[in-house]
Structure formats: C-alpha cells, structure tokens
Amino acid sequence: MQLNSTEISELIKQRIAQFNVVSEAHNEGTIVSVSDGIIRVHGLAEVMQGEMIALPGNRYAIALNLERDSVGAVVMGPYADLAEGMKVKCTGRILEVPVGRGLLGRVVNTLGAPIDGKGPVDNDGFSPVEAIAPGVIERQSVDQPVQTGYKSVDAMIPIGRGQRELVIGDRQTGKTALAIDAIINQRDSGIKCVYVAIGQKASTIANVVRKLEEHGALANTIVVVATASESAALQYLAPYAGCAMGEYFRDRGEDALIVYDDLSKQAVAYRQISLLLRRPPGREAYPGDVFYLHSRLLERAARVNAEYVEAFTKGEVKGQTGSLTALPIIETQAGDVSAFVPTNVISITDGQIFLESNLFNSGIRPAVNPGISVSRVGGAAQTKIMKKLSGGIRTALAQYRELAAFSQFASDLDDATRKQLSHGQKVTELLKQKQYAPMSVAQQSLVLFAAERGFLNDVEVAKVVSFEAALVAYADREHAELLNHINQTGNFNDEIEGKLKGILETFKKTQSW
C-alpha cells in the first residue's frame, strides 16, 4: 500500500498535534572530582548554601563551598562508587528530618531513618535541621527546675528548664553516666528526652540504649546516632538533627531535654570537612567559624513564652510555655579547659559541671568539682526546699577544701577546725551516689537536712553512706505521705521542718550509729 504526499502530510500533522511535551527544568552539574567524601561539582549556577544536591543512586550531598567556578559539597553516605563525569542535580531543598511523638522510644540515624530493627518510624512531618533560634522577645526567663537526681548537681549546680549546662571533663570521668542518669530521672517528670551520640562506638551506644530500656526511660527518649564508622558529614549534622526533633516538643508548649555526647567529636568532624574543602585553618587547625558551629546549635535550647507557643500552634495550645534544655558534653585533654573548643562552649553555655579525674579516681562519684562548677541561671529554678537546704553544703565543702590543704602542714588543730574538717568529710561522703540510682527531691532534701542540722555529727565518716541508705529506706517505708507532699510542692516551712526533724530523731533511735 502506497501513501500519497497529502496523506503523509496529514499523518505527520496528526502526530504533531498528539505529541505531548513534558518539560522538566532542573539545574544540572557534573562531578569534576571525588575525594574523601568531598565532591567538586561544575555547572550548578543556582545552588544555595546548605542545599541538598541529588546524586546518582538516591543519595544526597550538601553544598558547603560556593566558589566562582565550582561547588564543594560533602556526601552523606558512601561515596566510593561516585566518579568524575557523573551528573548531579539541585533539589531546591535544605536537609530535613522526621519529627514527632512516633520517634520516642526509637533509635535513628542522622537522617531520621530507624536503625533499631523495629520497623518504620511514625512521624508528624519534617523539620529543617538548621533553624533560627527564638529571639529575645519570644523567650521567657528560666524558673522551673530540671531534676537530675544527683544530690551534688541539684543542690549546688541546679539546672532550669531552657538552660544550657555544659558537662566537661577528661575521658572516663563519668560525663555520659551523669547525662544518662538525668534522662532516667525524667521518666515520670513529663520531660521528653533526646540523646545524640556523636562519633562513639556502636557497642557503647547499644549499652546506653539497653540501660535506658532497663530503667523504663527509653519510651520517653529519642536516640540519634552517628557512630565513629559513619562519615564526618553525618557526625557533623547529628546534633542539628537531634535539636530539630527536640524543638518539635518545645514549640508545642512541652518540655524537652537534649544531651549532645559529645560536641568535641562534632568539632573534629567539622574540622575534617573544612580542611578537605580547603578552607583556611585557624587555631588548633579548626576553621574560623567553629564558634558559630556550636553557638547556633546551643542558642536553639531556650524557654519560649506562651505567646510564641500559641502563635506557632495557631491557637491550639494556649497559656503554656515550652522549653528545650541542653546538656552538651565536652571532653578535655589532661584537664585543659583553656583549649579552643572548651573555652568556646563555656562562653556559650549558662554554666558548667566540671568532672575531675582525681576526684573520680579517689572514689568520689559523681566527680563534680564544686569549686569551678557553676550554674548561672539555675538558682532561680530551684525548689524552695532545695534552695533553703543546699546553701550550707557549698560553704561546708569550700571551707573543707581550704582547711584540708592547710591541715596537711599543721599538726595541732583546735576543736573548731577539727569539727569543720569532720563535717566536710561527711558532706563529701554524703554527696557520693551510685550510677542509675537517681533520688527524688524529697529524698535529697531529707539527706541534706540531716547534714545541715548536725544529725551527722555523731556518725562516723565510714558509716555515712550506710546511714544515708538506711535513712532513705526508713523514710520511704514509714513517711511516704510526707515525701510525696514535698515532691509535689517543693515547699519548705516550719511544719515540714518539724516533720523532717521528727523523722531523723526517731530514725536515729532505731539503731546506734
């Protein structure tokens, strides 16, 4: 069958009329070099700082260096199969992570993908990992406590909701233990917790998760993990991802606690990325913006006022303030708190808990050094009873340290000095506490009351720990109603003082100390 020219032209016209062009405009570039997780891309003229770049194989990179004729980007995930000449695309998006209550009780990676083998994560949407911190007008002063369950911290270095309290010390001084106990103590407080593990061994993190589960705290906690074997990019981004998950609760009028364990490793990961991107190194080879790295993260921990929460939730939540409390951890080298990263984070935070190797090795655990540990805003958040009873503890320890140094050279000491030394030794013993054994406000108050009002004067130093354990057990058994009242109100008046005195007097009659 032959077609004449008219039929052919009609057929072509018909085909042209039916042809449907689906146009997809995207900014495309070409990889010009790949090395150590860093790619250089030519041709992405419209890329933005921090934008996600789509790579072959459903992977992404983040644009960090925008140069005249190329873009330096860091790959999130494996990069061994990337090669020069491969095409990449702009996405027009910045990195987002899943947020919501469905993440509680789960272990996720930096990108929010589950790694605990419990199936997919339920989320209430996505949040960008980088967010601007609330402004001054949107904040409210810190006046509600976060109880860590540690006598030494809650009495001398109190932490408030919305505060940033640095935990700093050498390796193996109990920094993680203190933070984990603080999370365990929030089981019944209603405070949601986020634990961000940066650059740690997978076995260490598995142990932490197991402990949280054993003590019933995992259901209240999101664990964000970037292990030592993961890329520097994921270690650098993990704290921001965890912070976005914590902000979900803060912005909805709830309270959250986030632990960054630890920011020293994040700074090292960021230094690695910066050096590979050929950014100019500064002090200790860190880049010039390492202060901004931590300040923009820690400023997001805040207590926001009811107006902010109401505006954010579009009127769904009224009259409630929200808070995100941060416990960043920094590891020092041989107790050097004057190094670059420690001094940066000390200047950003609202106080620090300094843990000392010497104290830890001499059996004083938690190894808190009360001399240089401080809480700049937490005092306003302390409960009345703790504020009233904790004042003498810090003074007693300060006097004891001064006299202990002096008494090494003086052989004959007067009675007053001996009493102060003895009292200081007993208070030091009293502040010792086992791991995974947080104490309630009432239990702490009872123990501090005993020290403050001289009930330990006739107790031998060696028996102080057993005296405390027996006293707390006796009070829990015989006076649970009073302890519950103190836990609920936190008040201290003549009536409560009289009852506490009565408990101690009757307890001391039960056996000789």
Swiss-Prot record:
ATP binds at residues 169-176. Its EC number is 7.1.2.2. Its main location: membrane. Coiled coil: none annotated. It is a peripheral membrane protein. The record marks 373 as: Required for activity. One of its GO terms (cellular component) is proton-transporting ATP synthase complex. It catalyses: ATP + H2O + 4 H(+)(in) = ADP + phosphate + 5 H(+)(out). Keywords: ATP synthesis, ATP-binding, Cell inner membrane, Cell membrane, CF(1), Hydrogen ion transport, Ion transport, Membrane, Nucleotide-binding, Translocase, Transport. F-type ATPases have 2 components, CF(1) - the catalytic core - and CF(0) - the membrane proton channel. CF(1) has five subunits: alpha(3), beta(3), gamma(1), delta(1), epsilon(1). CF(0) has three main subunits: a(1), b(2) and c(9-12). The alpha and beta chains form an alternating ring which encloses part of the gamma chain. CF(1) is attached to CF(0) by a central stalk formed by the gamma and epsilon chains, while a peripheral stalk is formed by the delta and b chains. Belongs to the ATPase alpha/beta chains family. Produces ATP from ADP in the presence of a proton gradient across the membrane. The alpha chain is a regulatory subunit. This is ATP synthase subunit alpha. The gene is atpA.
